[in-house]
């Protein structure tokens, strides 16, 4: 080795591996208003100190790698590195802790959920020094949220488009989810809308299969919408699923929906991807279409308590990427959802300013500034007996969606829709009169069923149906 090379190697650079905590654990750091803040639930491998594990998360999700590199000297690590600035224990879990990490805003591309997640929940989740890692929450600063367009329209604009106020909206997923012909599918849509529902919905896995191609489904559903509107005098909609194998095909389907004059389309935002979702949201905003979002695949990511990503993070990401509705659990139905946690991310979807509240799983105060809100959709195993609880839990700004709870009515689809509409109107009227829905809910439904034979039949069919399993996702 030449003397010249030896001299260079000795100036400002020392090859080798050093502990992450020496660079990325900074307990004295004061967070900035422009930082993206993350709360990670960390389960390190035995023998790995909490400070080292937290620093490793900050490093591997920002500027760090496993060894010191020459090119560190060509940038300012102090400006660009993520910092683990606080560590706190998890009650009842000796081997876990919450690591708080601050990321400088310049690490992220403007208006790109894809880029944000590629860093924060990228390779770090496969890091060997960690047994498990879960992203519990993010604080998105206004400086970053203002680079996103957000929901295509938002709650108030949707109500104005539909001319529906003062109550939750009612929906229904057409069942069986797969196997119907386009004409029979359209007939079911018509019967449900005529019976009193505001919306019907494609199931998430209805795209363009051999038994029902997308164009045929769109045509028959549009016919059902316009016929039911003419008969009822109400504005109706059907969530036409535009999800496809390519972004180009997805946009083509949305264009056809717009040409038909329908009010709303749908996207599976996790299986379709955030880039596709944001592209579709931009199209919907520019062309007057509402956008319904289904969260298929979310439980793969968010259901395990120790690893993955909490749904409140996915909900925040969706609000930035763009959607007017998103499925958010039911609390009372067949799908996962603990009450306080669910209400926490429902507020994150709808409200402008949400205070930190650890009792509901909210780790950071979130300020959305002027970004429109998203309507939470309660769907999955719900029926007329759940209507008082759903009305009380979710309030007016929500969509209550009954699939089997409409189409499973013993008299058919239209009577099933009538039963749900009567139950909802009864609950809203009782609430407006000052009655307690949580305490008097069953009595309110029984009273309404005395003058609605459709509701009485529904009450009889589902009087014994319960889904009583302990929620996996608890505080």
Curated annotation (Swiss-Prot):
<dbReference type="GO" id="GO:0009853">
    <property type="term" value="P:photorespiration"/>
</dbReference>
<dbReference type="InterPro" id="IPR020888">
    <property type="entry name" value="RuBisCO_lsuI"/>
</dbReference>
<keyword id="KW-0479">Metal-binding</keyword>
<feature type="modified residue" description="N6,N6,N6-trimethyllysine">
    <location>
        <position position="14"/>
    </location>
</feature>
<feature type="binding site" description="in homodimeric partner">
    <location>
        <position position="123"/>
    </location>
    <ligand>
        <name>substrate</name>
    </ligand>
</feature>
<dbReference type="InterPro" id="IPR000685">
    <property type="entry name" value="RuBisCO_lsu_C"/>
</dbReference>
<feature type="binding site">
    <location>
        <position position="327"/>
    </location>
    <ligand>
        <name>substrate</name>
    </ligand>
</feature>
<dbReference type="InterPro" id="IPR017443">
    <property type="entry name" value="RuBisCO_lsu_fd_N"/>
</dbReference>
<dbReference type="GO" id="GO:0016984">
    <property type="term" value="F:ribulose-bisphosphate carboxylase activity"/>
</dbReference>
<keyword id="KW-0456">Lyase</keyword>
<dbReference type="InterPro" id="IPR036376">
    <property type="entry name" value="RuBisCO_lsu_C_sf"/>
</dbReference>
<feature type="binding site">
    <location>
        <position position="173"/>
    </location>
    <ligand>
        <name>substrate</name>
    </ligand>
</feature>
<keyword id="KW-0488">Methylation</keyword>
<dbReference type="GO" id="GO:0004497">
    <property type="term" value="F:monooxygenase activity"/>
</dbReference>
<dbReference type="InterPro" id="IPR033966">
    <property type="entry name" value="RuBisCO"/>
</dbReference>
<feature type="modified residue" description="N6-carboxylysine">
    <location>
        <position position="201"/>
    </location>
</feature>
<feature type="site" description="Transition state stabilizer">
    <location>
        <position position="334"/>
    </location>
</feature>
<dbReference type="Pfam" id="PF02788">
    <property type="entry name" value="RuBisCO_large_N"/>
</dbReference>
<keyword id="KW-0150">Chloroplast</keyword>
<feature type="active site" description="Proton acceptor">
    <location>
        <position position="294"/>
    </location>
</feature>
<feature type="propeptide">
    <location>
        <begin position="1"/>
        <end position="2"/>
    </location>
</feature>
<feature type="binding site">
    <location>
        <position position="177"/>
    </location>
    <ligand>
        <name>substrate</name>
    </ligand>
</feature>
<keyword id="KW-0007">Acetylation</keyword>
<comment type="function">
    <text>RuBisCO catalyzes two reactions: the carboxylation of D-ribulose 1,5-bisphosphate, the primary event in carbon dioxide fixation, as well as the oxidative fragmentation of the pentose substrate in the photorespiration process. Both reactions occur simultaneously and in competition at the same active site.</text>
</comment>
<feature type="binding site">
    <location>
        <position position="379"/>
    </location>
    <ligand>
        <name>substrate</name>
    </ligand>
</feature>
<dbReference type="InterPro" id="IPR036422">
    <property type="entry name" value="RuBisCO_lsu_N_sf"/>
</dbReference>
<dbReference type="InterPro" id="IPR020878">
    <property type="entry name" value="RuBisCo_large_chain_AS"/>
</dbReference>
<comment type="similarity">
    <text>Belongs to the RuBisCO large chain family. Type I subfamily.</text>
</comment>
<keyword id="KW-0120">Carbon dioxide fixation</keyword>
<dbReference type="GO" id="GO:0009507">
    <property type="term" value="C:chloroplast"/>
</dbReference>
<feature type="binding site">
    <location>
        <position position="295"/>
    </location>
    <ligand>
        <name>substrate</name>
    </ligand>
</feature>
<keyword id="KW-0503">Monooxygenase</keyword>
<keyword id="KW-0602">Photosynthesis</keyword>
<keyword id="KW-0934">Plastid</keyword>
<feature type="active site" description="Proton acceptor">
    <location>
        <position position="175"/>
    </location>
</feature>
<feature type="modified residue" description="N-acetylproline">
    <location>
        <position position="3"/>
    </location>
</feature>
<feature type="binding site">
    <location>
        <position position="204"/>
    </location>
    <ligand>
        <name>Mg(2+)</name>
    </ligand>
</feature>
<dbReference type="Pfam" id="PF00016">
    <property type="entry name" value="RuBisCO_large"/>
</dbReference>
<feature type="binding site" description="via carbamate group">
    <location>
        <position position="201"/>
    </location>
    <ligand>
        <name>Mg(2+)</name>
    </ligand>
</feature>
<keyword id="KW-1015">Disulfide bond</keyword>
<keyword id="KW-0560">Oxidoreductase</keyword>
<dbReference type="GO" id="GO:0019253">
    <property type="term" value="P:reductive pentose-phosphate cycle"/>
</dbReference>
